[in-house]
Amino acid sequence: MNLIQRPRRLRISSGIRDLVRETELSPRDLVYPIFVVPGVHIKEEIPSMPGCFHYSVDQVALLAREIAERGIPAVEVFGLPEYKDEIGSSAWDMTSPVQRAIAAIKEAVPELIVIGDVCLCQYTSHGHCGELHGRYVDNDATLPHLVQTAVSQVRAGADIVAPSDMMDGRVAAIRSGLDAEGFVNTSIMSYAVKYASGYYGPFRDAADSVPSFGDRRQYQMDPANVREALKEAALDMDEGADIIMVKPALAYLDVVRQVYEATDRPISVYNVSAEYSMVKAAAANGWIDEQRIVLETLTSMKRAGAKIIISYHAMDAAAWLNV
């Protein structure tokens, strides 16, 4: 058979496959999310997210060192507060676990990039992402609270703030608020394209942020829409976002690619809790090769255009990649 083109020639050995590989996953692509809680000497596994834990602030310095040793450049900090109220005021309380954890991480590992999650759902008594007017989340009344939260996290030492609330205009408000406080070099990683997804279930258990009524479809995006994603990304860029996020990641790789092609900003994705937990459950039952599935999944996100991948698999993935 006279075949001039034989694509298998470039697959014939591991060395040649490595030589022509188009997408190379690295620990430097990853961000590890951590959950901090009130109390001391706490490291408790989250039941719906095997391998992920709640940490008290006194435990995060050791964790930060382990993360850095694996070559992961950044963490994103989420927290459960000591108290909740109607407006989520513990979100900007400098004595809350998130602010204290940020400070502890920066003291222990100054070179580790710390991202602060800016939202109110963990902090409000009703579990929604903003201040309520009746049963409606009041967009404009919420913005000052988000600004206060972002500023408090940066005062604690955060390098990047990541508004995940999906209120209109929050990037501009936060940018203005940070600049007014002199934090002109603090980056904003906007959850610009955040869908009202069923893939968040385990996270809401981990963060104790299930809404007490209704859902978040009034402010998070319809999973059926992609043109809206491009609009949201463009609006947040115009408002000053430095990094654009798509969340979730795996079911939205088509969206990731289109946003990547439409913008000159770095793209981040969030490999969310149910994506993680489904893999862990299948692996626990012996149905899949966990390492192979995880690395293939993360590579698909980078191949689609993501420069930054926030993933609960990050610690394991980094260990596998470093072998």
Task: Identify the function of each model-found stretch.
Residues 1-21:
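N-terminal amphipathic/basic leader segments beginning at the initiator methionine
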Residues 2, 13, 25-31, 37-323:
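Alpha/beta enzyme core
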